[in-house]
Amino acid sequence: MQFEFQIEELEHKIEELKKFAEEKEVDLSDEIAKLKDQRDIALKVLYDDLTDYQRVMVSRHPERPYTLDYINYITTDFIELHGDRLFRDDPAIVGGLCKIDGKNFMIIGHQKGRTMQEKVFRNFGMANPEGYRKALRLYEMAERFKLPILTFIDTPGAYPGLEAEKHGQGEAIARNLMEMSGIKTPIVSIVIGEGGSGGALGLGVADKVFMLENSVYSVISPEGCAAILYKDPNRVEEAANNLKLSSQSLLKIGLIDGIIDEALGGAHRGPEDTAFNLKNVVLEAVNELEKLPVDELVEKRYEKFRQMGVFNR
């Protein structure tokens, strides 16, 4: 990322010193440690003051952990479940049964790809109606077996293709919103990267909604907003700022319940540390939600979303 050029220079110097020390068999550990300290200080200063559009760039970083990465980090005994039982399986959404610290969960999330082949297979994390219907099937299964649900949101948006529209994209998302509001089991949703519009909401009606520190959640991308609203693609930074899409902005206006700290320099630099923080937040939230009677749990979830956007003088 362009705004990290100073960090990249320091990391390049660190790698050069490591290589030189190995080749010449000399001890340069003190010099390397000093450079690492400089890098860490520079990272903290930079990431404490990112602009909204810089956070958008971090949320899209190609090395940022995806749903299956977090599943590998925080769960055991994961069994993936496939298909919507109506038409086909959509690999842009993955889900299944797992354990987190010995506790049974149903876990569901958007999945992007890393290689070009994987990106095409996963449709860049943009789900078709079949993906949302698969998710709904898993929600209902979790309710039937009294399993808490954990969802990961990471999509630029629902797939807008002609076939998706023919198969009822709008209906599939709308039905998920309706059904999730009444599912009789605890639901925790976490935005781990991009939270793009209705495509994100299809997995986002939950008792507790959290965002990773450098994730974003918005009705439209900054690029789309700049093109449609300002008729100027160069105004993406202004659009990002006006959309209030960062975790910090959304926490202030009450649209999310909390922010999960990422590793220094973003989740892509410390995926295991970020996953550890995420796991602790999930377990704490679920333990709290399970203390509520089911009817009260559902009523509070419904009221939580009904209150969003209400204007009080």
Swiss-Prot record:
Main location: cytoplasm
Pathway: Lipid metabolism; malonyl-CoA biosynthesis; malonyl-CoA from acetyl-CoA: step 1/1
InterPro entries recorded: Acetyl_CoA_COase_a_su, ClpP/crotonase-like_dom_sf, COA_CT_C
Alphabetically ordered keywords of this record: ATP-binding, Cytoplasm, Fatty acid biosynthesis, Fatty acid metabolism, Lipid biosynthesis, Lipid metabolism, Nucleotide-binding, Transferase
EC numbers, comma separated: 2.1.3.15
Any Pfam family hit: ACCA
Alphabetized GO MF terms: acetyl-CoA carboxylase activity; ATP binding; carboxyl- or carbamoyltransferase activity
The keyword Nucleotidyltransferase is assigned to this record: no
Protein name: Acetyl-coenzyme A carboxylase carboxyl transferase subunit alpha
Listed transmembrane segments: none
All copies of domain CoA carboxyltransferase C-terminal, residue ranges: 34-288
Compartment(s): Cytoplasm
Family membership noted in the UniProt record: Belongs to the AccA family.
Keyword Cytoplasm among record annotations: yes
GO biological process, one term: malonyl-CoA biosynthetic process
Quaternary structure annotation from Swiss-Prot or TrEMBL: Acetyl-CoA carboxylase is a heterohexamer composed of biotin carboxyl carrier protein (AccB), biotin carboxylase (AccC) and two subunits each of ACCase subunit alpha (AccA) and ACCase subunit beta (AccD).
Any one GO CC term of the record: acetyl-CoA carboxylase complex
Gene expressing this chain: accA
EC class: transferase
Stored SUPFAM superfamilies: ClpP/crotonase
Function: Component of the acetyl coenzyme A carboxylase (ACC) complex. First, biotin carboxylase catalyzes the carboxylation of biotin on its carrier protein (BCCP) and then the CO(2) group is transferred by the carboxyltransferase to acetyl-CoA to form malonyl-CoA.
Reaction catalysis annotation: N(6)-carboxybiotinyl-L-lysyl-[protein] + acetyl-CoA = N(6)-biotinyl-L-lysyl-[protein] + malonyl-CoA
